[in-house]
Each structure stands twice: as structure tokens, then as C-alpha cells.
């Protein structure tokens, strides 16, 4: 089993990074640090992983005094990069949070790191690749789930395309699920 001393999840959401590490059989002997500002996401993380050390806003990273960070994961806000959005790219202030990730990488110099984001315009992808010194791996979540979401992963960890599990929408549907208006009543009856 692989063991990491400390892990830092930036833009950590509901700490899916912790779920992934658990499923991969990777143990954290020290702390899992989370930088997240959404109160609902923090609540979910704290319920599922009560030992998570909440650091708050990445903009306060210079105040953090973390030691022996072996892994940094990040998936900065994607709205500015998304082809489905307005494509403001780095003109969207949320997109510039990518540079906070880069500064944090330089500050802690972890053994491993991973940055995830949406599929984007090629020139922006190239710009991010240039800054990180790595080309991304494009993975479509449709290979492992019942959704079609292409994501780019920049990392210094060797990764390969996952095997297609052949999961389709009907595989995840609850049989005989009532119409949406009755959904809450349905689940209340099951409790």
C-alpha cells in the first residue's frame, strides 16, 4: 500500500480527492488539508471526513504553514475555460485561480501533483501546458460512468486511459421511480 505524509486538495469541493485516494488504496499518514470556500461543500466534507483540516480560501495560502506535502490536487473553477460557457478564459477572475495553484505548487514543491479542468480552447490548453511543463491527458468520464464529460488532467503521475466499463444511463436508474413531483414523497416513504 502506498502511503503519503500529507495531502493538500485545492478547490477541494466535497473532497472527491479523498474518495479517490481511498479507492486507490493510498493511505494518508498525516493530514488531508482542504482549501475550499463553499460552505455546503465543506459541510459534506466534514460529515464524510471529519479529520479534514479546513484551510479556507486559497488566497490566504501564504498564511498556511504546511509541512511535508506529498500530493497537491486541484480543479480550479472551470466556467471561464469551458467551451460551453462564454469562453472568457483568463479574463474571467475565476480562471486566474489557476495561477494560485501554480504558486502553491512552487511554495510546497510536492512529490506528486494533479490539476484537472474541462476541455477548453486549444490555445488556452497550450498556455496551461507551458506553465505546468506537462501535456494533459484527455479522459472522458463516459468510460467509467453514465455521463459524457471530457476532462483534461495535467500531472506528474503516470496515468493511462481507464478501461471502458460500458456503463449507460439505464444502469444507474432506479426502477419504477415516480415522476419528479412525487420524488421527495417517495424517498420519505422509504425512510
Show the residue positions of the predicted features.
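Conserved active-site and SAM-binding loop architecture
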Residues: 1-191
